[in-house]
């Protein structure tokens, strides 16, 4: 049997970051264009506004990121200014073992990187997902690292950091 796990024919999974920075609902614009309408803005109308971060929340057990299927016993989404939670989770939701482990995307926006990181820290603190293991502790750990706040990292940084945790 074959399953389509995800089809990104137009939008990327990170599109909420673009939406937050530019203040444009990309899905709405896509539907407008598909309906034969023009977009509701011009290229010159777009202005970069602040900094946005998205973390992909997965039902995975650390440190090896193995799948963590099961039933959500308690769920509370964070909220507030500059916080967006995209998820279909609810109390009692059953996460099957057959598909991608992505269970939500937490997107934050602030005037600058420092404010976005502070909002991410607050939002992760408000977020409750009980009943399965998730990658939320990974993001708490990352936010405690100076390099994340200063932007002093590269594509190998995470792998090296994870190695230090398992030592």
Question: At which residue positions do the language-model features occur?
Answer:
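ATP-dependent carboxylate activation and anion-phosphoryl transfer catalytic cores
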Residues: 1-167
């Amino acid at each position: 049997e074959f399953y389509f796990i995800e089809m990104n024919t137009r939008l990327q999974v990170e599109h909420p970051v673009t939406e937050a920075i530019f203040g444009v609902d990309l899905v709405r614009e896509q539907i407008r264009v598909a309906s034969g309408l023009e977009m509701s803005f011009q290229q010159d109308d777009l202005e970069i506004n602040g900094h946005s971060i998205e973390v992909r929340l997965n039902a995975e057990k650390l440190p090896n990121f193995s799948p963590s299927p099961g039933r959500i016993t308690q769920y509370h989404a964070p909220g507030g200014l500059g916080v967006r939670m995209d998820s279909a989770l609810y109390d009692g939701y059953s996460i099957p073992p057959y598909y991608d482990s992505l269970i939500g995307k937490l997107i934050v926006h602030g005037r600058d990187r420092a404010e976005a990181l502070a909002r991410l820290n607050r939002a992760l603190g408000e977020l409750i997902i009980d009943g399965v293991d998730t990658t939320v502790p990974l993001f708490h750990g990352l936010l405690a690292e100076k390099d994340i706040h200063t932007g002093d990292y590269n594509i190998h940084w995470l792998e090296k950091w994870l190695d230090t945790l398992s030592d």
